[in-house]
Amino acid sequence: MKKKILLTIGCLIVLLVAAGGGYVWHVLHSVRSTAGQMYDTGGGSGNHQAITSKKPINLLLLGVDERKNDRGRSDTIIVTTLNPGKKTMQMISIPRDTRTEIVGRGTTDKINAAYAYGGTKMAENTVCNFIGDIPFDFYVKINMEGMSDLVDAVGGVTVNNKLDWYDEGYYKKGYHYKRGEITLDTGAKAMGYVRMRHKDPQGDFGRNQRQRDVIMAIVRKMSSVRSVSRYQSILKALGGNVKTNLTYDDMKNIVFNYRDAGQHSVDYEVKGSGKMINGIYYLVVGDAEKQRVHEMIADQLGD
């Protein structure tokens, strides 16, 4: 459940856990400078001891649309919990239109507005409050334009498309996305695929699923890359579009300590009711659903 990995593109964590130890270990030895380029403490310094001790960790994955002179909003919000003991990776997506308190601002708004108002830290505090005051150990933020760069870097991806439509939206390229297995051979074509919402009867939920599919397709493609030139293109795409408070050593420790967490994956999207409030559409999440999400995360963080 996620709008644009995730890192859902997936996000660096998904890539590290899902790609497998051997190849990623080789990669990490070669990406110290890239890791340094990605390192940022905008969301806090991180809980490095948890990774060293092989404790369950909670990560906030943000997909943002940042452009020059525009911070944008975090249209992808995924709470990812890794538990090496239970060998599970749980990913809970929070729809961008979710109505909630914006912590630090004293207002109620769409949850994706927190990033626009106060950057990573306000987004982290707001999501933490929404899930019942469960803190995050780390965050990973990707500029979603970077998904386009990554698809180009891996040489395109193949996905199973459940709908049939022409792109008349964000890119307006007129691409025809046929139902069934299709190849998104360029970043632009992939972006048109993951951004479409209005032609999908499931709206945001359907878009989130397509984004997850593309993220995992990127993960699979990355895990099989052996070309040096392709590898360098991937590093460039990551370094230019990802920010995280995970250090290089944290990434290495994730490879060793959390590789089993990818054996069982739990994917969930927060549910609610769509409502118009003062002329604005929101997804209103009930208390029972919030409690369910809180308990799902708390359970995964238990030993």
Positions of the model-derived regions?
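Non-catalytic, solvent-exposed segments at the cell envelope interface
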Residues: K2, G10-C11, A19-D303
